[in-house]
Amino acid sequence: MQAGLSLVCLVLLCSALGEAVLKKPKKQAGTTDTKTDQEPAPIKTKGLKTLDRGWGESIEWVQTYEEGLAKARENNKPLMVIHHLEDCPYSIALKKAFVADRMAQKLAQEDFIMLNLVHPVADENQSPDGHYVPRVIFIDPSLTVRSDLKGRYGNKMYAYDADDIPELITNMKKAKSFLKTEL
């Protein structure tokens, strides 16, 4: 009986000592730990969401529709709003095609205020013919929705699919060129 009790006490003692060894010592007031003071904690980036949402890291994206309208007016550039859903296969395909096309990326970087939205906006001008995705709407610096710049579908005027990148680029160029002739 005494041997069993001694064994239990020994196991508990070893367990307590093991925990004490593995614990980090507490800092005393007035002392500094040079390692933790100099090295910031690592930043976890896995799963981090950015404003580009995969549409182009080198493009400057605005966060909200209101911010986009203000910047369009302030910078005298058209606002291009991409409405999409992250789990929609058509949105994913358009995103991949848009990212892969150098001209689309260049125009977006240099000539547009860019916004991509995964939720509807209160402005009904953003959905004149429905709330489908993906759809791309152009707004000029006078804050007018460009209803003349649309995709090739009659029933979903602002829809584009992955094969429509040339049409989208044409509309981007038109949106940009109208600035020179209209304003």
UniProtKB/Swiss-Prot annotation:
Superkingdom, natural source: Eukaryota
Organism, as annotated: Xenopus laevis
Gene Ontology MF terms in the entry: dystroglycan binding
CDD domains in the cross-refs: AGR (cd02960)
Name this polypeptide is given: Anterior gradient protein 1
Tissue spec. comment: From stage 18 (neurula) onward, expressed in the cement gland until it degenerates. More weakly expressed in the adjacent hatching gland.
Role of this protein: Does not appear to be required for cement gland formation.
Family: Belongs to the AGR family.
Keywords per UniProt: Secreted, Signal
An annotated GO cellular component: endoplasmic reticulum
Compartment(s) of residence: Secreted
Signal peptide: 1-18
Keyword check for Glycoprotein: no
Pfam families: Thioredoxin_7 (PF13899)
Gene name of this polypeptide: ag1
